[in-house]
A protein has these predicted regions:
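Class I S-adenosyl-L-methionine-dependent methyltransferase catalytic core
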Residues: 1-156
């Protein structure tokens, strides 16, 4: 295992096939304090397989993969909020936009995984301009965030 106390450093590039990535990988990278990580955050796959307008219709496999990717079920509170419109029977859950999910995951990388610096992610679009991924950089070094912010700003 790479450890900060041994002065080892590593760069980890994570490009998961959809939601097929375990949170434990990101958690270990952050807690090692020795790994800088690029992550393609698969927001399109999340929308296709786990975060639907009607959360009750999402297949169990999609929910399970999202939970494994996120690390726990807290993603549900991020992905859905109670509707502000009155409903006489029970509160209706409304799907939140991608930016809310991305912002919450950025905070999760900082607060839960332990990365000190997580750059504002860059949306990666396909040929029809739909966002497929968000490219994250998570690091322990402020200079890494500064460099990536400078590079990403050229593509926003």
């Amino acid at each position: 295992m790479i450890q900060y106390k041994k002065f080892n450093r590593a760069l980890c590039l994570l490009d998961p096939y959809g939601l097929h990535l375990d949170w434990e990988v990101m958690l270990q990278a952050g807690q090692s304090r020795a790994v800088d990580m690029f992550l393609n955050f698969p927001v399109m796959d999340m929308n296709r397989n786990a975060i639907w307008k009607d959360p009750d219709k999402v297949p169990k496999g999609g929910v399970d993969r999202m939970t494994k990717f996120w690390g726990d079920e807290s993603w549900k509170q991020v992905a859905y909020a109670e509707s502000r419109q009155a409903n006489f029977f029970e509160p209706e859950m409304v799907k939140q936009d991608n930016q809310q999910i991305v912002t919450a995951f950025r905070e999760r990388l900082k607060k839960v995984a332990g990365f000190d610096h997580v750059a504002e992610p860059l949306p990666m679009k396909n040929s029809t301009k739909a966002v497929v991924y968000y490219l994250f950089l998570a690091s322990q070094k402020s200079v890494a965030e500064k460099i990536i912010d400078d590079i990403f700003s050229k593509y926003r």
